[in-house]
């Protein structure tokens, strides 16, 4: 068979830059640095237990079970991935600052490195609780513009709506390593050639089908969901005999990168909605470095991303680590769920398909 000539990530970025004659090229350098960080993390993940990086991270006192700003137990690979993102991206002169799920405050670019005009926010290793069971994990990132003239960055500088993103993407560390990227002109997927150490364009112009018969949600939280979500899931579970007149499949991986990737590949809808399980955390996912980057990708691929009440990318952030309810995927399904939120007559009335203790009604 003749060898297929594929475009590299570098070539792709050069082609994109040519669409903007006044561009400096610094943006390309930033994306390539992010890609390099993802390559390093992919290598560490691939070694698994052989690399000695499985298990919980240690505290400064040497005790197992370090906790991040989110109150979550850190894995060793969480810490390594965060350090890798900082080290690879701080020196290039493209960034004014960074923010991470693993750090309470913004990261200042060291004085011995030049400052740039962009901000980078990231979740260095999404789904890290799955590491020890060898389920796909990933890194999520978003690029914003930095304010001009400031010597240091503040939390306020990062509090920009998703609509202000310059680029966003994720790396998926699975059977193959993929980088899925939008620079505001559609969504493209690149696969890492482990022999050459280069990302090649393998999935150009990704599109999310508008309709689907597949949804992803953590059904164990059903008793805490709001009525519109209970109604939607109840109708899906009723299948052909219910109001939707068709059967649905349910998926749940507990790794948002893996869920988002499946939806970009074949459609579906993902829900981690607002609920009442923990009044201090009405939403589970973080707006700036989880929800917004995925929302940008979904919208650029023809899908939709929402809280149920408004589009995700229109939300004005109030804090660096703000949590929010998230619904994204096939446009028609997300719009249906939004309609249920808008048109609910009694927000406390669950669907009759649910009872007090079960996802679906017991047989009569």
From Swiss-Prot:
Keywords: Carbohydrate metabolism, Cytoplasm, Hydrolase, Magnesium, Metal-binding, Plasmid. It catalyses: beta-D-fructose 1,6-bisphosphate + H2O = beta-D-fructose 6-phosphate + phosphate. Binds 2 magnesium ions per subunit. One of its GO terms (biological process) is fructose 6-phosphate metabolic process. Its cofactor is Mg(2+). Pathway: Carbohydrate biosynthesis; gluconeogenesis. Signal peptide: none annotated. It is found in: Cytoplasm. Pfam families: FBPase, FBPase_C. Mg(2+) 1 binds at residues 101, 123, 125. One of its GO terms (molecular function) is magnesium ion binding. Its EC number is 3.1.3.11. Mg(2+) 2 binds at residues 123, 126, 290. Substrate binds at residues 126-129, 218. Gene3D superfamilies: 3.40.190.80, Fructose-1,6-Bisphosphatase, subunit A, domain 1. It is an enzyme of class 3 (hydrolase). Its main location: cytoplasm. PANTHER family: FRUCTOSE-1,6-BISPHOSPHATASE-RELATED (PTHR11556), SEDOHEPTULOSE-1,7-BISPHOSPHATASE, CHLOROPLASTIC (PTHR11556:SF35). Homotetramer. Belongs to the FBPase class 1 family. This is Fructose-1,6-bisphosphatase class 1 3. It comes from Cupriavidus necator (strain ATCC 17699 / DSM 428 / KCTC 22496 / NCIMB 10442 / H16 / Stanier 337) (Ralstonia eutropha).
